[in-house]
Structure formats: structure tokens, C-alpha cells
Amino acid sequence: MPRREIPFVPDQYYHFYNRGNNRQVVFMERENYVYFLKGIKRYLRGRVEVIAYCLMPTHYHLLVKVVAKHQTSEVANQTSEVLRQDASKQVSLAMQKFLISYTKAINKRFERTGALFQGQFQAKPVTTYKYLLTLCAYIHAKYRRYTPSLRAR
């Protein structure tokens, strides 16, 4: 995967999202949604705080805040730049492992092969308070708009 141009900075907000490869469905049944949410908890706990999320049949949106590492004696002497780089790598690696894990589970469950998502997950920094509020409202509005179709699954 190509290197991410924008690093993840502790205490900053980001919009993570991706969609199915060729816009295919990535959540085929209710259990897939549950498995995805459990994966977020398993892989991203301690690295990001999920502020809002929306899982749709063909894609997902996550509004997250990168968690600042607690200062310990081991890392106290490191510069803030080193800590930023470490947080950025940890978040990227955790998301990568999480999405690979989810893809493998779906491929096994539905006897399929290949990529499930359209490339690397997208991550946009949330640079203003206004954008944070707008994004949060957008994510929740998308969920309400698609809730009837999710209940049918």
C-alpha cells in the first residue's frame, strides 16, 4: 500500500471511510455489522476514540479522535515528533490489520476471494470545529436515511 500522505496526530479528529470494491456490498447480513463493530473495538481501542459511525451496505464512515499516548517513563524522553510518528504508524497499522481481518472473515463466510474494499481506507483530517459538527451531523443523517434498508437485512 502506498504511504499515507497525511499523518495521524494525537488529539486530532479524522474521517475514516471506504467502500466496497466495485461498489459491492460489504455487509451482507446483520452479523457482518456486529463483527465489524467488534473489530473496531478489538483493533482500534487505545489508538482512536470513535465519536460517530455509520455502516451502510456498501461502505462505512467513522469519525474518530486519535488518542494521545500516555506519557510513561519509557516514552517521556522522546520528542513530540517521534511520538506523533509512532501514533500515526499505530493507527495506520491497526486499521490495516482490522480491515484485512474483516475481509478474510467475509471471504471465508461467503466463499469468495480477493479484495473486499476499494484500496486503502480513506482518512481526512477534521480541521475546524464547524467541519467536526457538519461531519457528525452528516454521518448520523446517513444512518437515519438508510436505517429501513438495514433493518430488512
What name fits each language-model region?
Residues 1-153:
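Short catalytic/metal-binding and nucleic-acid-binding patches
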